[in-house]
Each structure stands twice: as structure tokens, then as C-alpha cells.
UniProtKB/Swiss-Prot annotation:
It comes from the Eukaryota. It is found in: Nucleus, Nucleoplasm; Nucleus, Nucleolus. Residues 165-174 have a biased composition (Basic and acidic residues). Residues 94-146 form the bHLH domain. The modification Phosphoserine is found at residue 109. PROSITE patterns: BHLH (PS50888). The gene is Hand1. GO terms for cellular component: cytoplasm; nucleolus; nucleoplasm; nucleus; RNA polymerase II transcription regulator complex. It comes from Rattus norvegicus (Rat). Efficient DNA binding requires dimerization with another bHLH protein. Forms homodimers and heterodimers with TCF3 gene products E12 and E47, HAND2 and HEY1, HEY2 and HEYL (hairy-related transcription factors). Interacts with MDFIC. Interacts with SOX15; the interaction enhances HAND1-induced differentiation of trophoblast giant cells. Transcription factor that plays an essential role in both trophoblast giant cell differentiation and in cardiac morphogenesis. Binds the DNA sequence 5'-NRTCTG-3' (non-canonical E-box). Acts as a transcriptional repressor of SOX15. In the adult, could be required for ongoing expression of cardiac-specific genes. Phosphorylation by PLK4 disrupts the interaction with MDFIC and leads to translocation into the nucleoplasm, allowing dimerization and transcription factor activity. This is Heart- and neural crest derivatives-expressed protein 1.
Amino acid sequence: MNLVGSYAHHHHHHHSHPPHPMLHEPFLFGPASRCHQERPYFQSWLLSPADAAPDFPAGGPPPTTAVAAAAYGPDARPSQSPGRLEALGGRLPRRKGSGPKKERRRTESINSAFAELRECIPNVPADTKLSKIKTLRLATSYIAYLMDVLAKDAQAGDPEAFKAELKKTDGGRESKRKRESPQQHEGLPPALGPSEKRIKGRTGWPQQVWALELNQ
């Protein structure tokens, strides 16, 4: 028996039947041809801008950049997130609230100091309202008047000079006024004539000082 002849005959007999459609399908039995056919498709899909980003225009920002820009806005920075801005907005009113309170305390302190200074000026009529500028001018004039009185006492032979002491005394302003009253009588202006009217409550201090300061 001829093996070659029988093999050729058997092989020829095997191919005499009509081939099945699945036997020549390139998807199952042709990986090389399948890769060759699909390679242009993948290359065009990767390199084509229209296929690569169908939802975004060509040359535009990446999806992550577009999402970030939509969330924060074109000019926003990551540090200016809405939550951070709300937190800063909640803290700012509390910081501003301390400003008016501090300014109010400062104004009250200044007003109290001027009120004490007005009380130190002697013979101020009860119906007279002094502004801060007039209070400072009268206080300056009164200090000059007291220094002139002390200078006259020093010329008379008194060895002690006036010294300003910043110590609190028990008597307070009343004792200070009592100490100043003898000095005020020594520097009285000349007696007024019968035709001149003397203003009540302004004795002990030259009347022209009041006339000059209150008329300004």
C-alpha cells in the first residue's frame, strides 16, 4: 500500500467538500491579518483630534483643566475656593467690630481728661461751656498766671520755687484749690472804678483773660 498516494488521495478528498464559513474567518484564525486590518483604524483614532476629543475643540485645555476652570472661574486660584472665602467673610465682621469699640473708649478717655482739666481752671461760670480748644487756652493762661505769681514771690525773698508733683493727694482738687487761693489774692488786678461793672464769680484771675479767650 502506498502511503503517499493514500495521503494525497485522502487530502484531496478532504478538500472536495465545500468549506465552512467559519474556517476562513480572519477574526478567529488570522491574527496577523486582523492586526494588519485594524492597525490603520487605531492609528487614525489616536492621531485624529476630532476622534481623540469629540466633546472638546481642537487645541483646547484638557478635561481636567476645563473642569477646574468651570468650578473656580477663569481668574480664580485654588486658595480662593468658595469655602475659604465664606470662612474669611465670617471672620472679617468680628475683626471690624473691635475697631469702633476701641475708638469709643479712646474718645471717652479724652473727654474725661478734658472734663478734669476744666475743673482745675478756677472761677469758671456754671453757664459757660468750654470747647476743647478754649479749655487748653485757658489752662495755658492759668499756668502762666501761676508762674508769674511764683516769680514775684521768689523776688520777695522766698527761696523755694514751684515744683510740679504728679502725686495723688487725699484732699484731691479741693485741697489744691485751697492752696491756690492765697496765691490768687496776691495777684489781684487793680480795683475797678465805680462806673465799671464787676462780673460775679470771676475774682482771683485777671478778667481780661476771660475776655480774650471767650471772645475767640
